C-alpha cells in the first residue's frame, strides 16, 4: 500500500498518475474533498481507497493502520491557502498532522517523502537554499511549513 496525502490536489493527483504509470495500483488517497470539484483530479486514476483526512488521522491514532503493509508515504497534503487567518487550524492541519504522519512512518521504517514550500523563503530576497538565514515566512501557511521543516531537521539532522 502506498499512501498519498493531498492526493486529490494538483501535485498529489499527478503523483498518483505517475505511480499508476509505474504499475502501482495499491494507492490510498488521503484528502479533504470540501470542494466538490476536486475529485475530478482523480478521474481515470487507479486508486485502491480514499480516506478523508480527519477519518484517516483518527484511524492512524487509533491503531487501525498498524497492521497495514504501507510501503511508502508521500505527504503532499496541507491547507495551502495563504490567506487563511486561523493560525490554530493551520498549525493543526499542516504542522501537527505532518508530525503524526512522520512518526508513524519512522516507527515502522516506512519511507516518508513530504512537500515543503518555497513560501518558507518569503520573497526570496535572501536566496532559496536550506539555510536558516534565507528562511523568512510571511504568512501562517509558510510558517506552518517552516516549523515542520525545522522539526524534521532537528529530529533527523542527517536526512536529505
Enumerate the predicted regions with their spans.
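SDR active-site strand-loop-helix element
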Residues: 5, 30, 73-77, 112-118
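Glycine-rich phosphate-binding loop and adjoining beta1-alpha1-beta2 segment
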Residues: 28-56
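NAD(P)H-binding glycine-rich loop region in Rossmannoid oxidoreductase-like domains
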Residues: 44, 53-54, 58-93
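N-terminal Rossmann NAD(P)H-binding glycine-rich loop of SDR-like oxidoreductase domains
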Residues: 2-24
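Catalytic helix-loop patch of NAD(P)-dependent Rossmann-fold dehydrogenases
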Residues: 92, 96-100, 107, 111, ...
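NAD(P)-cofactor binding segment of oxidoreductase domains
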Residues: 15, 68-73, 85-113
